[in-house]
Amino acid sequence: MRKFIPLFSLVLLLNGCISSGPTDNVGFDKFETIRELEGIYQNLGEREQGAPPVYLSQVIWPKTEGIAHAAITAIEVRLLSPNTLGVRASSKDGVEKEDTFVEGKDFEIHSGRIRLKPSFTIGGLKPEAPILGLFYERDELGFDRKGHGKLRKQVGIVGLVYMHMPLAAGVNKEVRFIRIDKVPNP
């Protein structure tokens, strides 16, 4: 029986949740209409010290090739219709990317936040992979209580480590995107 105590302790250690965020991180505030999202936001997000950079443009266009995210300085959000947002990424050289996003097709609004479509993947199908399991990822965008843009990235996994040890873990990463201007100039 004593042999199983260290193994059980290790399983408990591997199951858990980790959260991180920028200095002076504050919670989400709710918005009533997507018109409130109009504004210009800093592309480079604020995170905990020492963390790799997160760009708002990467959250908006995660699978688009050829975007120099580090060169983009600002993201402009405009309301085009009651359920459509126009988003423009700008650098010092001009517009890098522009797109429209429609509520119900590209995003959902839940509890005063934008929820991007979640992704589910199965990992560990290669023989050398240490974890076999289901991976889940979801991004939520909105405002923090100071009026700045806020991202919460939720990542979770449920699976087996080396096909023997159960694992359930989650990570919440929060990023602040400074709101440079509340209403874009026409």
Language-model features: where?
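Amphipathic/hydrophobic helical signal segments and adjacent flexible N-terminal regions
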Residues: 2-9, 15-76, 119-127, 135-140, ...
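Short, linear, compositionally biased motifs with a strong N-terminal bias
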Residues: 10-11, 84
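Predominantly extracellular/secreted and cell-surface proteins with exposed
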Residues: 78-125
